[in-house]
Amino acid sequence: MSLSGLISTTTFKEQPAIVRRSGNYKPPLWDAHFIQSLQVIYTEESYGKRINELKEDVRRILEKEAENPLVKLEQINDLSRLGISYHFEDQIKAILNLTYNNNNALWKKDNLYATALHFKLLRQYGFNPVSSEIFNAFKDEKKEFKESLSKDVKGMVCLYEASFYSFRGEPILDEARDFTTKHLKQYLMMTRQGQNVDHDDDNDLMVKLVEHALELPVHWRMKRLEARWFIDMYAEMSHHHHMNSTFLQLAKLDFNVVQSTYQEDLKHVVRWWKTTSLGERLPFARDRIVEIFLWSVGLKFEPQFRYCRKMLTKIGQLVTTMDDIFDVYGTLDELSLFQHALGRWDINTIDQLPDYMKIFFLATYNVVNEMAYDVLKQNGILIIKYLKKTWTDLCKCYMLEANWYHSGYTPSLEEYIKNGWISIAEPLILVNLYCLITNPIKEDDIDCLLQYPTFIRISGIIARLVDDLGTSSDELKRGDNPKSIQCYMKENGICDEKNGREHIRNLISETWKEMNEARVGESPFSQAFIETAIDFVRTAMMIYQKEQDGVGTNIDHYTKDGIISLFFTSIPI
């Protein structure tokens, strides 16, 4: 048969076009050339000597005895909010130990501010037990908080902040939160209406503090951004209340010098991201290397963790890209092939993958192996199998969500959360972080960590729910899986999304109580590492502030402001 005859008698099946979704993500805000052009001014070499002198001055201040323990507590609180308490952990613990073990509490008797500040600091620094029953002293014969307390705005703010360190089964702190929230809102309303007589600079500062607290409590805020805000507030206070000028000088210099290390590290990760070509080759995915670096600073802001931040940023951007592959771009068959290849962790298996997956797999493979090699050099332990497990666990959860989407299945809220606290990638990030900051690494400890203990599960749940509040509206518009809000609504026959969102907010608040318990509970892991799990949540609450998506569709709002203040704007000295 002639070739022309073969062509004329053969029916060719046209391959159906693959329909792929789009996340409609905005391009990156930050130009790589701008990042590389940043001028580093406040270097350790130039300002290290002055910082060390100021640190010695602060140590002397902390070690100087005070007649009233409240003075020392205020110093600790100021150092914490200024972002420099990490230099003085030993001195702070020594002071708090004295107040914790001292039964003579006349200095705080009938003083709401002193009582609340002491309680807050003890819980903040992990002392246990610290009974919330001390606040019964501020109730009346009806067992309700005395209305007269509302006149003590400073004490009310402190009680409000303290209430966010509550455990389960502490109704008095729930009552305290409701009571203070109500009266602080009334205080703001009356001040705006000119009904507060004392309208002066002090009152203006108090209004700012109250507004800031009601927007989000300090316990829920990203530490470094909170420090940046409070440094400006402290400078304003110093003109009226004779705040400690040494504290302020150190806070400003410390912030600027640490910011310089962030600038250098940001240049590094931006160069790395450019060399991967993933931003160009996978244009459907979020190109958010600067925003992810902000997240790494939220987890470990101290200057000694530079390598940790750089590696976490690389890992975080890869996780974000993989999330978009599964959520937006990949077909079910492609995703299944990718899951198999990742499970094998063998570059010889990637020939069967589509091109966009090949380059992504190799980029991930190289970063994970680079990290494992560095840890092997430093610690003498091979961690590939541990890192691989975190990636395969995450991929398994992504795959389940993809199957839900393609089958049109809506899980129950419990089923959704059971998968979602892992798919938020918090377990992967924390296991990697543990390997980056721990020396020596003990196999028993990392085996335990890979069982994802309670503090990892709880922080993952909160982060997932916070993420859902910020992203569900945009994701549903493009046809994504139902989020926790919609799962709850369908399960309970609720039509009004406001009710669904309110339930998730309440669930977040209740789960925070479990997180507070985990901070002081028995664990083979250090309190500092457990605190990092909480910092993951704090950073999530900043990224998705006011229930907006600061990594996906709303990058030019709160996240942008945070990046500018932390990385690009130094504090005038």
Curated annotation (Swiss-Prot):
Tissue specificity is: Expressed in glandular trichomes two to four weeks after flowering onset.
What EC number(s) does this enzyme carry? 4.2.3.15, 4.2.3.121, 4.2.3.16, 4.2.3.-
Binding-site list for (2E)-geranyl diphosphate: R286, D323, D327, R464, D467
| Provenance organism | Cannabis sativa
Q: How is the cofactor bound?
A: Binds 3 Mg(2+) or Mn(2+) ions per subunit.
Q: Which family does it belong to?
A: Belongs to the terpene synthase family. Tpsb subfamily.
The catalytic activity, as recorded, is: (2E)-geranyl diphosphate = beta-myrcene + diphosphate; (2E)-geranyl diphosphate = (1R,5R)-alpha-pinene + diphosphate; (2E)-geranyl diphosphate = sabinene + diphosphate; (2E)-geranyl diphosphate = (4S)-limonene + diphosphate
* Pfam families named in the record: Terpene_synth, Terpene_synth_C
Q: In which pathway does it act?
A: Secondary metabolite biosynthesis; terpenoid biosynthesis
Q: Does the keyword Magnesium apply?
A: yes
Indicate the enzyme's highest-level EC class. lyase
Keywords from the UniProt entry = Lyase, Magnesium, Metal-binding
What name is this protein filed under?
Myrcene synthase TPS5FN
Where is Mg(2+) 2 bound in this sequence? D323, D327
One example of the protein's molecular function in GO is: terpene synthase activity
Which top-rank group of organisms is this from? Eukaryota
What domain comment accompanies this record? The Asp-Asp-Xaa-Xaa-Asp/Glu (DDXXD/E) motif is important for the catalytic activity, presumably through binding to Mg(2+).
Q: Where does Mg(2+) 3 bind?
A: D467, T471, E475
Q: Where does Mg(2+) 1 bind?
A: D323, D327
Stored SUPFAM superfamilies: Terpenoid cyclases/Protein prenyltransferases, Terpenoid synthases
